[in-house]
Structure formats: C-alpha cells, structure tokens
Amino acid sequence: MFIDYSKILKKNLKNVLHEVLVIIENKGLKEGHHLYITFDKNHKKLKIPNWLKNKHKNNITIVIQYEFWNLKVQKNEFSIDLSFNNTIANLTVPFDSIISFADPYANFGLQIAKDNSLKKEKKEKSKIHKNKIINLDKYRKN
C-alpha cells in the first residue's frame, strides 16, 4: 500500500486555514492580524463576480482585514463579502482552490501545492520505481 504523504499534508494545511477562518467567524479578527489568501481563479467550484475574475490572470489574492462581512465557513469552502474599490462582492472560495495564505502580523504563512503538481510528482516517482526493477532471469541457472 502506497502512503500518499503529499495528499495527507495538503489536507492538513487546508485544515489550518479552515480552523483560522472558523476562529475569525466566531470571534472576529483581532487587532493587527490580517490574512492574505491566494486562490486559483479558474477552479470549477469558485463563485466570484465576472468583473473580478476578468481582472486577474490566474490567481487572485484577497485580504481579510478591515472591510469584510458575512464570513461563513463550511467543510469544503468559505464565503465572504469583501469591498473592492467601494463595491461589495460576495465570494465563495473552495478550500481546494487555495494556493497560499499568510498572516504577516503573526509572521505565519503556508504554501499549498496544486493538485496537478502532486500528480506530476507521483508520475515521476512511478518512473523511478519502474527503473529499479531488475530482471533476475539472466542470473538463474538452468
């Protein structure tokens, strides 16, 4: 049985952000703390206004600090209202779309590998294992 450490680690990194957001949802954001959350704008379950999606190439970074409302944290996603140039936008962000998050006040940040990089890593490991197979037939006595 293959133990997929990358998958386990990625799941637990997302759980750190999930727990932080639950704390903020229940108790608010303490003075000084602020989060930078970067996510893949092309994730299939991401729900953001088109004008915001069109403004960015691949990834979007949001800041949760002063002007945010209605933070709701679910098992697989969170939703939040944020102000962009005096326009309120509702975002629903799946945890699977998260690339990184940081709290500069706490000097804390995490980088979360994308799924396709994990698949590439597995493929490379698979090639390595195939190359280590030794055919013993030539060493056998008849």
Enumerate the language-model features and the residues they cover.
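Phosphoinositide-dependent membrane-docking surfaces
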Residues: V93-A102
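Short, intrinsically disordered/low-complexity patches at protein termini
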Residues: L71, D96-S97, A113-S117
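N-terminal targeting peptides, primarily Sec-dependent signal peptides
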Residues: F2-I3
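Short acidic, Gly/Pro-enriched loop/turn segments at secondary-structure junctions
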Residues: P104-N116
